[in-house]
Amino acid sequence: MKRLLAFSVAALCLPALMLAQPSDGSKQVEYQFTTVKANPITSVKNQFRSGTCWCFSSLGFLESEAIRLNNIKDTTLYPDFSEMFVVSHSYQDRAEKYVRLDGKLNFGAGSECNDVLYVAKHYGLVPQGVMPGLNYGTELPVHGELDALAAAYVKVITSNPNRVLSTAWKKGFQGIMDAYLGECPTEFTYNGVKYTPESYRDSYKINPDDYVSLTSYTHHPFYEKFALEISDNWRWEQDWNVPIDEFMAALDNALENGFTVAWGTDVSEKGFTRDGLGILYKEQVKKTSGSDQERWVGKSEEKNDEPQAPEEEVADQEYRQKGYD
């Protein structure tokens, strides 16, 4: 069976012009982009005030895969998978693991792409309209209360006040998920067809076992699998470790041949902006103090009326490893 790549980006396709927007009234830095390859993608969804970016982005990848696998040309027929169906199953599995490990596991909103593939494989998928996951009075996800309540619940369970776990604790946690996100359906009718989550997934020819996950680090041998040591990889799923040049070549090859990709990254770095830019600054630019404009272009002794783009870092294998370590 042909194995596909899962490391996530929807398409190598960007607008022709994007602007670095300083907040001090100075001129914008303009970046010109050229579309090299545009593969079919679904619309960008709003995770709003939830920590479930991993689910929104990875389901976007699976939606693009459904388009490709079924050769869907009509955009009105593009799938829209329910994020909160995946989130509910993920949280419930994480709660069980957290309790098994006596609380020695990260219990938060974060996760990664392999989690979505796991849920799709073991529980299936459902349409957004069947489980919108908004049972708490807002039109967009707001998970502060849900996350705090879920974390408090599992902490109480692991404190073991009864000296033995009750038979009710899993149902109690599921009740929290059901109250906020809605019950995960085991059967539903959509567009006149009756499905289970598994049969709905299969109707789009999605097989989670067809995908492989790649990473690139030097603290493990290349061409072997290992579980990346980050707190969000709470399922301890394993990735194939390859040299960074091969990692990027695999990405380029996938995109060029019509495949979309799931790319996991940390968007808390300063180089990410709200208007859609991601720039890996040179270290001295990161440390530049002063105005927002100075952080973008670096402070110069000579005034320049034209804003200058910040110097970018070249991320080689050593640089990547240093950032991880």
Where are the regions that the model predicts?
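Catalytic-core signature of thiol
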Residues: 22-303, 307-325
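Bacterial N-terminal signal peptides
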Residues: 7-16
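Positively charged n-region of N-terminal signal peptides that target proteins for export
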Residues: 1-4
